């Protein structure tokens, strides 16, 4: 399970940081050092299971929520690297009148 999570994390860094060698290298080094730190954990231990779940969550977040952009030369606009895995919202909350609270699963942003 740990090897699979590690591979998912490396693939997610490649997708999220494609073309940015410095950030890609840093993210992969961070993943490697974290996995090496947890290397001594037994596969069935709660700490190991939690670490693997965390790695999978980070991989999912990188794949779906991280988008890099580059500033266009001579312009104030940015070109975003939106890829097939990027989560796209419908922006329904923007259309809500001012003063309304958004409730998701019974919780608001204040909770």
Curated annotation (Swiss-Prot):
Transit peptide segment: 1-48
Domain of life: Eukaryota
GO molecular-function terms, A-Z: protein folding chaperone
Disulfide bonds: none
Cellular-component GO terms for this entry: mitochondrial matrix
Region (Disordered): 88-111
Localization of this protein: Mitochondrion matrix
GO biological process, one term: mitochondrial respiratory chain complex III assembly
Known partners and oligomeric status: Interacts with RIP1.
Functional note: Assembly factor required for Rieske Fe-S protein RIP1 incorporation into the cytochrome b-c1 (CIII) complex. Functions as a chaperone, binding to this subunit within the mitochondrial matrix and stabilizing it prior to its translocation and insertion into the late CIII dimeric intermediate within the mitochondrial inner membrane. Modulates the mitochondrial matrix zinc pool.
Homology family: Belongs to the complex I LYR family. MZM1 subfamily.
Name the record gives this protein: Mitochondrial zinc maintenance protein 1, mitochondrial
Gene (name only): MZM1
């Amino acid at each position: 399970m740990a090897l699979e999570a590690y591979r998912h994390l490396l693939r997610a860094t490649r997708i999220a940081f494609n073309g940015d060698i410095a950030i890609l290298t840093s993210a992969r080094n961070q993943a490697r050092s974290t996995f090496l730190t947890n290397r001594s954990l037994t596969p069935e231990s709660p700490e190991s299971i939690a670490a693997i779940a965390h790695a999978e969550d980070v991989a999912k977040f990188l794949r779906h929520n991280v988008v890099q952009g580059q500033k266009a030369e001579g312009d104030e606009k940015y070109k975003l690297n939106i890829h097939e895995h990027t989560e796209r919202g419908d922006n329904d909350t923007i259309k809500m009148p001012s003063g309304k609270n958004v409730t998701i699963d019974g919780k608001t942003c204040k909770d």
